């Protein structure tokens, strides 16, 4: 599946209403529900085998979604970033003049005050060759 970042809406597909039923309809594939835990406000939807995982608030409004490199494409400013090497992403963001912060635990980077996070788990070991495994969009 293909998704695109929107500074205004987080993900262009979710412009407007982001209630659980609409998110499920828009993604349009099989999903399973993981029960609420002590760390989440509500249950979590997992789409496909590894397309996306969505978090909702107590009112079933989307508050965050993570897209995975195995079965998704995620575009930022017109370029696919999932599955790319960190050096590609770093150079691309630099070209755009986008400043990023390295996560405290060294597992990725974030931009736009943490609203968009790139999970790069091997960043410390593999450096510029580490792969972007997922992208998390925060709607809070």
Predicted features along the sequence, with ranges:
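Short helix/turn-capping signatures at newly exposed starts of structured segments
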Residues: 1-140
